[in-house]
Structures are given as structure tokens and as C-alpha cells.
Swiss-Prot record:
Function: Part of a membrane-bound complex that couples electron transfer with translocation of ions across the membrane.
GO MF annotation terms: 4 iron, 4 sulfur cluster binding; electron transfer activity; metal ion binding
Gene coding for it: rnfC
Protein name: Ion-translocating oxidoreductase complex subunit C
Membrane-protein topology: Peripheral membrane protein
GO CC field: plasma membrane
Lineage: Bacteria, Pseudomonadati, Pseudomonadota, Gammaproteobacteria, Enterobacterales
InterPro entries recorded: 4Fe4S_Fe-S-bd, 4Fe4S_Fe_S_CS, Ion_transpt_RnfC/RsxC, Nuo51_FMN-bd, Nuo51_FMN-bd_sf, RnfC_N, Soluble_ligand-bd
Source organism of this protein record: Erwinia tasmaniensis (strain DSM 17950 / CFBP 7177 / CIP 109463 / NCPPB 4357 / Et1/99)
UniProt KW Transport keyword: yes
Keywords for this protein: 4Fe-4S, Cell inner membrane, Cell membrane, Electron transport, Iron, Iron-sulfur, Membrane, Metal-binding, Repeat, Translocase, Transport
């Protein structure tokens, strides 16, 4: 008894609410076998022929392709598109595709070469010898999608049902009027359909396979039973004819008695459904190694002279199919892609065949009836009685028409399968399906925008978090750097203190200090001389901006220059004398040497500034200056030269006085030679300054003033010579410390270098003076100047000869 109940339950069929029984009109096309059509002049292949994203293009215009060659590639829901024949890719451009909106999409255009050559195939006879994932990958690479009308990628559907599916349903109902593509396919290729069903069952590891077919297809039922024979792995279930029994949820309810939950999928209840055409395409992809390049299309309608089913290559224009079917267009002729209830009218016949194209309907005007105008809803509830999804079409109509998206969503408009049963029974001729499709599209756009906004928000928040993390990382890095620097500074300070303590404990010899101080003094003197030389060059290159000057202003500027020179000379004289008074007996020799070098540099700069200041006034003065100003300028120049010589001699004698407490004969001799050289240079500088004044233009000089100026110059030169003699004799009297010959040699070399530089400077100053213009020189003044120069030279030579 229990076995009889199980057998009864296994063969039992259920029913769904609603549904209609429209005229079938299938006998127009199911009586002739499948036939092939010649190739069109051009193929148009849309990149997107399925639910999902379009793949990446793998060819370029001008490429030669073979049949079955992939033109695009991708993963997941990005199904590839294959070349329907061999030929050349002519272009890649937008073109109108099979969609109710008639929008243009990106398409590949192929010009066939007529050879129809296949690419290399990869057949697999024993599919049970490979992994199931490999079979799913092959299905994806073949570009197989749902051929029943939805166009969902088959590989993605199989991958989602690899676990938990115990029932596989092969949908052979084909309930919509006029369409006979699956019917004719089962009649002509029943064995291949069953083999594809077995491959799908093997991939899913399904416990049972149910083939649901309506009872209005006796030839197809007979062909399937004949091909099945005595096999028990597949079960053929003949169901009553009722529209829309071919819907996924409706057929699942009929064969299993289970209902797919709202918002869920059939896999949630352990059921997965595939179309008859999809099973045939899977067999071709696995066993034969052929990708999806063609499908069965029904050509029917009273406007077609030769209705039937044909093998149509993907990308074939609809006009090419109708042309070979004897299409006779009438007045206001319409052509529908799909059935009369779920199809849509084509905007043009250039639309290509795609993977979801199952029927081309070209009805006559009498066949479709008159196009009656839409009227107001009378609330008859006939649409609710006919709805197979148990919805409220009337309420959905009001919400869709009023744009109330929230209410439409709340009334489960997403569960509408757009079967058209409500519109078929509506007495007011309201195109309800049109409203529902538009409302679904608007809701989808709103959801997409919300998803993009959420994604943008998440990206913004992620960016903010990343910036905060980077900021915290930088702050931590800076803190670590500060700590490391502080620790390193502390270590360096401690190490320096230890070195100082060790040096103080061990003691440092004075000889090393002397060597270091001598080197530092030489370096400081060299740097000072370089700076002075650069200053001279800069002063020489500066142009004279004032061409004319008032005599009164010239006198004022000369007085200011004399005052500045006097202060500079006093500072230079005071700087070397202060150091010995302030320095303690314990000062290091290095400090004394550095102070002496600094004093010499300052004295030299002061002397150069003094020489430059009196010479500027005569250059800037007009040729109309009086002779008295020239005499005054000469006297000022001689006075500044004398002060500069005294400062140089004082700076030269200070270093030995401070750093030589004990007498050394060799150092004394070197110091004496240095003093004589400096005295000689000072005398030469005095003579040059004395001779510069007469060379300046003095058109009306007075003999008395010239004599006075000469006497003053002789007296100053005599004082300079006496000062030089005194400085030369003082050096040997100073006690010299015990020093080694190396230091003496270094000191002598330094003295010779300084003397040489001073001589060169004196020669340069002497040669520059004659170059000055003296257009109105007096012979008497020239004679007086020559006598003064000879007297000064004689006085300078006498002390030096006595010392030698």
C-alpha cells in the first residue's frame, strides 16, 4: 500500500492559481522540419545578449575570424560571444538591438567569406571523466545562456546549484501561442536533448530529472519517449495545456507542488530548471566542443508564406530570415519578436538575432484584430483572477501610473513575470504589462542610484579612515624620530663630555696647541685677504653714478670720510692692545694668534677704506675745483696712509709679544726681517699717497701751498720711518720661547708671503696713480714731488742699512 502511495505521489501533478487558455496557433509552424538558411551579407553581433555585463572585446577591425572563435571574453556573468561564421571584422560600432527600448548598443560587424570554416574544436566524449567544475567552465566558454527567453548565463546558474539541488526540471512546456521552436527541436533532436539533460544532471548531482511538456505536443512527446527507451534516469511528465504553465515558478508548482518563496530562488527549495534548447546547447558544447553560434527560431504569422522553424545564426538580421520565409508585408505591418503575449514589436527589421530570440511573428491585420483605444479601469478584478503569481494587477496599475514606487514595491511588483494574462483578459484594453515594465525599470534605476550612493559613501568613509590611519602613522613616526634624536643627542653629549674629561686628565702638550694655533692663524689671514681682494674688485667695478658734484658737498663728504677712517684706525689700534690686557696668563696661544690675525685684517680694511674715500671726491668733483681742495685731499690721504702703516706694524708685532715669553734668536731674526719689510711697504705707500695728490687736476696751484704740503709729507714720512725702526728693534728685545725649527720656518714663510703680497699691493697702487688723467700738470709741482719721493726713499733705506 505504501509503495502505491509513493508511486502516486511521484506521478502526481499540481496546479497553480490563475492562467488563461488563448488560441494556440501552433500548427502553422510545427509541421515542417528544421531547415538551414544561406548566410547573410553581414552579421551584426551585440556584445551583450544575456543578463549581465558585456564582455571585453578581443578583436579589432580587419581581423580574420573563424566560426566558433571567441570575439569577447570575461568571467562570471560576462558571457563570450563567438563568430557565427568565418570572415572579417569590418567594424565595431553601436547598432539597434533586440530590446523594447530600441536603444543602440555596441556591436561587432562581420563580413562572411562564404567558406564557413570552424576553429579548432575541443570535443569531450566521456564527460564523467573530468571534474564538474571543468564542465561548468566549458559551458561558460561556449557562451551558453538560457534559451527559453530569460537569457540568464547557464554556467552561473549551474555554479550556484552545485550543492543542495536534488531535482532538475527540463522545461519543455512552451506554453505561449505561435511558438514551436522547442517542439520542433524535440521532434528532430530528441536524443541530443536527453543527452544534454543527463550532462546537466551529472553536473548538479541531481537525484531526479523531470521533463515537463504540455499535452498539445504529441509528436514531441512520442519522440522523447522513443529516445528515452527503457532508461529510468529521466522522467517525462505530460502536463495540461494552460498559459503560462511554462513559467519557472508555475512549472515548479505543477511538477513538485512546491512554491518558490517571495524574493527567493528555486534553489532554495532544491530545484533548478533549464530549457530544452539550453540542454541541447550544453550537449553541443561538451560532447561536440561547439560554442553557441546558432539557435532554432520560429517564423510564423499569416504574413509569412513559408512558416516554420529554421537554424538561425546569431547576428543574422531579421530581414534576412523573413526574406527566405516568403514575408509579404501588409499595410501597417508589425513584426513581433517573441510571442503575442510576452513579445515586443520591432522598430526595424535590421535588428539581429540574439540568444533569446525564439520566434519572429509577422501577423496580418485580421489576425491581430483591431487596435482598440485604452479605456478607464472598471475594477472588474478579471486581471486578479487571471494572474498566475497571485498579485493584485489593479493596484499595481494605479501605483505604476501614479509613480508611487514604494507602494508598488510593497505590493511585490518584482514577482510579476510579465506573462500578459492580465492584459489579455482586461475589458478596458489597458496595456498593463507596459505599465509594469516601465515601473520595474524606474525602480531598478532608483535602486542602482542608491547603490552607487552607498558605494560612494563607503568609499568616502574608507578614504577618511585611511587618511586618519596615515596621519596617526606619521604622528607616531615623528614621535619615534624625536625620541631617537633625543637619545642620540644625549649619547653624543655624554661622549663629548667623556672625551673632554679624558683629555683634561691626560693633559695636552703646548706644542700641539701652537701648531694648531699657527695653522688657524694662517687660515684666518688667508680668508681675510681673500675677502679684502673681493671687496677691492667690487669697489673697482662699481660705476660712478654722480658725474658732477657741488664743491661744498665734496668737502662735506671728504670730512665724513676722514672721520670714519680715523675711527677705523683707532679701532684697529685699540683691538690688538686690548687683547693682552684682557687675556689671562693662562690663555692659549691659539686665541692670541687668532686675535692678531683678526686685528691685521681689520687694519688692512680700514686702510683700504681710507685710501678709497679721499680718491672718490676728486673723481666726482667737477673740473672747476679750487687748488685748496686738492691740497686738503692730499694731506688727508697722507694722514690716513700713516695711520694704516702704524696699524699694520702694531698688528704684526702683537702676536710675537703675546705668544713669545722667552727669547729665540731665530725667531727674532725672522721678526726683524718682517718688520723691515713692513716698514719699507709703509714708506712706499706714503710716497704713493704723496704723489697722487699732485697728479690730480689743479689748474691754479699756489707755490706756498705746495711747499707747505711737501713739508707736511716729509715730516709724516720721517715719523713713519722712525716708527718702523722702533718696531724693528723692539722685536729682538722680547723674550722668545723655546721653539723647534719647524715653527720658525713656518713663521718665516708666513712673513715672506705677507711681504710679497704687500709689495704687490704697493706696486699696483703706484701704477694706478699715473693712469689718472692730469691734463694740466705743472712742471714745478712735478719737480717738488720727485724731490720729496727721493728724500723719503733715502730716509727709508738708511735705517734698513743700519739694521743689516
Amino acid at each position: 500500500m505504501l509503495n502505491l502511495l509513493n508511486l502516486f505521489k511521484k506521478d502526481r501533478l499540481w496546479d497553480f492559481d490563475g492562467g488563461i487558455h488563448p488560441p494556440e496557433m501552433k500548427t502553422q509552424s510545427n509541421g515542417t522540419p528544421l531547415r538551414h538558411l544561406p548566410l547573410p551579407a553581414q552579421f551584426v553581433l551585440p556584445l551583450k545578449q544575456h543578463i549581465g555585463h558585456e564582455g571585453e572585446i578581443g578583436v579589432r577591425p580587419g581581423d580574420q575570424v573563424l566560426r566558433g572563435q571567441p570575439l569577447t571574453f570575461g568571467t562570471g556573468r560576462m558571457l563570450p560571444v563567438h563568430a557565427p561564421t568565418s570572415g572579417t571584422v569590418s567594424k565595431i560600432a553601436p547598432h539597434m538591438t533586440a530590446h523594447p527600448s530600441a536603444l543602440a548598443e555596441m556591436c561587432l560587424f562581420i563580413l562572411p567569406d562564404g567558406e564557413d570554416r570552424w576553429c579548432e574544436k575541443r570535443p569531450l566524449e566521456d564527460y564523467r571523466s573530468v571534474e564538474r567544475s571543468e564542465l561548468v567552465a566549458r559551458v561558460h566558454q561556449a557562451g551558453v545562456a538560457g534559451l527559453g527567453g530569460a537569457g540568464f548565463p547557464t554556467a552561473s546558474k549551474l555554479k550556484g546549484g552545485l550543492h543542495g539541488v536534488n531535482t532538475l526540471i527540463i522545461n519543455a512546456a512552451e506554453c505561449e501561442p505561435y511558438i514551436t521552436a522547442d517542439d520542433r527541436l524535440m521532434q528532430d533532436h530528441a536524443a541530443e536533448v536527453l543527452e544534454g539533460s543527463r550532462i546537466l544532471a551529472w553536473i548538479l548531482q541531481a537525484e531526479r530529472v523531470l521533463i515537463g511538456i504540455e499535452d498539445n505536443k504529441p509528436e514531441a512527446i512520442a519522440a522523447l519517449k522513443k529516445a528515452l527507451g527503457s532508461a529510468t534516469d529521466l522522467h517525462i511528465r505530460v502536463i495540461p495545456t494552460k498559459y503560462p504553465s511554462g513559467g519557472a515558478k508555475q512549472l515548479t508548482k505543477i511538477l513538485t507542488g512546491k512554491e518558490v518563496p517571495h524574493g527567493g530562488r528555486s534553489t532554495d527549495i532544491g530545484v533548478l530548471m533549464q530549457n530544452v534548447g539550453t540542454a541541447f546547447a550544453v550537449k553541443r558544447a561538451i560532447i561536440d566542443g561547439e560554442p553557441l553560434t546558432e539557435r532554432v527560431v520560429t517564423l510564423t504569422g499569416e504574413s509569412v508564406a513559408q512558416p516554420g522553424n529554421v537554424w538561425a545564426r546569431l547576428g543574422t538580421p531579421i530581414s534576412h530570415l523573413l526574406q527566405h520565409a516568403g514575408f509579404i508585408p501588409g499595410a501597417e505591418q508589425m513584426v513581433v519578436m517573441g510571442g503575442p503575449l510576452m513579445g515586443f514589436t520591432l522598430p526595424t527589421l535590421d535588428v539581429p538575432v540574439v540568444k533569446i530570440t525564439n520566434c519572429i511573428l509577422a501577423p496580418a491585420a485580421s489576425e491581430m484584430g483591431q487596435n482598440e483605444a485604452e479605456q478607464g479601469c472598471i475594477r472588474c478584478s478579471a486581471c486578479a483572477d487571471a494572474c498566475p503569481a497571485a498579485l493584485l494587477p489593479q493596484q499595481l496599475y494605479w501605483y505604476s501610473r501614479g509613480g508611487d514606487h514604494d507602494k508598488a514595491r510593497a505590493h511585490n511588483i518584482a514577482d510579476c513575470i510579465e506573462c500578459g494574462a492580465c492584459a489579455y483578459v482586461c475589458p478596458s484594453n489597458i496595456p498593463l504589462v507596459q505599465y509594469y515594465r516601465q515601473e520595474k525599470a524606474e525602480i531598478q534605476a532608483i535602486d542602482l542610484e542608491a547603490e552607487r550612493a552607498a558605494l560612494a559613501k563607503n568609499r568616502f568613509e574608507a578614504r577618511q579612515q585611511r587618511l586618519e590611519r596615515e596621519k596617526a602613522a606619521r604622528s607616531a613616526k615623528h614621535q619615534q624620530a624625536k625620541r631617537s634624536v633625543a637619545s642620540s643627542d644625549a649619547g653624543a653629549i655624554a661622549a663629548a663630555r667623556e672625551r673632554v674629561a679624558a683629555r683634561q686628565a691626560e693633559g695636552v702638550s703646548p706644542e700641539n696647541h701652537a701648531d694648531n694655533s699657527l695653522q688657524a692663524a694662517v687660515q684666518a689671514q688667508h680668508e681675510a685677504e681673500v675677502r679684502v681682494h673681493q671687496a677691492d674688485l667690487q669697489a673697482a667695478n662699481e660705476p660712478v653714478t654722480r658725474q658732477t658734484l657741488d664743491p661744498r658737498k665734496a668737502a662735506v663728504e671728504a670730512a665724513i670720510a676722514r672721520t670714519k677712517a680715523k675711527k677705523a684706525a683707532q679701532a684697529a689700534e685699540a683691538s690688538p692692545t686690548e687683547a693682552p690686557q684682557q687675556s689671562a696668563p693662562e690663555d692659549e696661544p691659539r686665541k692670541a694668534a687668532v686675535a692678531a690675525a683678526v686685528a691685521r685684517t681689520k687694519a688692512k680694511k680700514a686702510a683700504q677704506a681710507a685710501e678709497a674715500s679721499p680718491t672718490e671726491a676728486p673723481q666726482q668733483s667737477a673740473p672747476e675745483d679750487v687748488p685748496r681742495k686738492a691740497a686738503v685731499a692730499a694731506a688727508v690721504a697722507r694722514a690716513k696712509a700713516k695711520k694704516a702703516a702704524q696699524a699694520a706694524e702694531a698688528s704684526a708685532t702683537e702676536a710675537p709679544q703675546q705668544s713669545a715669553p722667552e727669547h729665540d734668536p731665530r725667531k727674532a731674526a725672522v721678526a726683524a726681517a718682517v718688520a723691515r719689510a713692513k716698514a719699507k711697504k709703509a714708506a712706499q705707500a706714503a710716497e704713493a699717497s704723496a704723489t697722487e695728490a699732485p697728479l690730480q687736476p689743479a689748474p691754479e696751484d699756489d707755490p706756498r701751498k705746495a711747499a707747505v704740503a711737501a713739508a707736511v709729507a716729509r715730516a709724516k714720512a720721517k715719523k713713519a720711518a722712525q716708527a718702523a725702526e722702533a718696531s724693528a728693534t723692539e722685536a729682538p728685545l722680547q723674550p722668545a720661547p723655546e721653539d723647534d725649527p719647524r715653527k720658525a720656518a713656518v713663521a718665516a714663510a708666513v712673513a715672506r708671503a705677507k711681504a710679497k703680497k704687500a709689495a704687490q699691493a704697493a706696486e699696483a697702487s703706484a701704477t694706478e696713480a699715473p693712469l689718472q688723467p692730469a691734463p694740466e700738470d705743472d712742471p714745478r709741482k712735478a719737480a717738488i714731488a720727485a724731490a720729496i719721493a727721493r728724500a723719503k726713499a733715502r730716509k727709508t733705506q738708511q735705517p734698513s742699512m743700519q739694521e743689516d
